[in-house]
A protein has these predicted regions:
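Active-site neighborhoods and metal-handling regions in enzymes and metal-associated proteins
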Residues: 1-303
Length: 303
């Protein structure tokens, strides 16, 4: 992974990349620590660790008290171009890191990291599939934890407990300073049409401190329940959405659900390398309009 990033650095004529975010440290080092990873375009990457102090020091692992000690191990004065995680950090942190390289111009390393991470190795693909397999196994147990008289929040808590019992780490990271989520979302009744301030396809009223998902709606006969929970059974996530019914639903609900499944399968077949995302969207919209279902497309016009 480091070598892939070094190739990208050389292609962009950037001499080094500084990584500080937890998720990218995990991706590149296999663990999370307080400190930074310095990746030169040529040569070995260097870890500078503030906490914990339990890592054994070596030629590439250094214990530090503050990031300014980077210059004790690297000639920071000769670097002319450095990439920082500009989309991930506070302005003050970025300024502090820029002072480490007084003669450098700075570039956004977030895009480089994203470009490297989007290419999955066979091992990474298998890790994702294993997470999804475990996720599916848990979803098959969901009907067993439903009890009459529950609210949507009661039901969601039981599902969250079920997922944790089967190995979910329970932590879910969202990219973006204004993005937040817990383990997922459960929507039922009119609450499913409530818009959210977050950049998710669906909303739900939630609570003021987390306006997303369940809101203590009583679950009743004839109600559809959408369960959209994230699975974290390793280093990769899976995101699985299923719709359940409490008893029988109106025939229109089954028709629209079948239409959604058809669109899903068609997009899988059409989404090839080089496909236009806009055209895939427009084709789905044409199919929905032809089926007289535009008012229901993507859940709600408010979202």
């Amino acid at each position: 992974r480091v070598e892939r990033l070094q190739e990208l650095l050389r292609s962009a004529s950037i001499e080094a990349l500084v990584v500080t975010s937890n998720v990218n440290l995990l991706y590149l080092c296999g663990s999370i620590f307080s400190g930074l990873l310095f990746i030169p375009a040529e040569g070995e990457a260097q870890c500078f660790i503030r906490r914990p102090q339990s890592y054994p020091e070596s030629s590439t692992v250094h214990s530090i008290r503050k990031i300014e000690q980077l210059s004790d191990h690297i000639d920071t004065l000769t670097l002319g171009s450095v990439a920082l995680e500009l989309d991930e950090q506070s302005y003050s942190d970025i300024q502090r890191q820029q002072k480490l390289f007084p003669n450098a111009t700075f570039h956004n390393g977030t895009a480089l990291l994203r470009q490297a991470r989007m290419r999955k190795t066979p091992l990474e693909i298998e890790q994702t599939r294993e997470c999804a397999r475990r996720h599916v196994e848990v979803y098959e147990l969901i009907p067993q934890v439903y009890r009459p008289g529950m609210t949507d929040r009661d039901f969601q808590i039981e599902i969250e407990r079920l997922m944790r019992q089967h190995g979910s780490v329970g932590l879910f990271r969202c990219f973006g300073s204004a993005m937040e989520i817990f383990m997922g979302s459960l929507l039922a009744g009119d609450n499913a049409g409530t818009a959210s301030p977050y950049d998710f396809a669906l909303g739900g009223a939630g609570v003021p401190a987390l306006p997303l998902g369940s809101n203590d709606t009583p679950l009743k006969e004839g109600m559809a329940v959408m369960v959209d929970m994230a699975g974290n059974y390793g280093v990769y996530y899976s995101d699985l959405t299923r719709t359940y019914s409490i008893g029988q639903l109106p025939e229109e609900a089954y028709r629209l659900h079948d239409l959604s499944l058809q669109l899903h399968r068609e997009v899988i077949q059409q989404a090839k390398p080089g496909s236009s995302c806009a055209e895939l969207w427009n084709e789905c919209l044409r199919r929905v309009e032809a089926a007289d279902a535009k008012d229901y497309f993507m859940g709600t016009e408010l979202q």
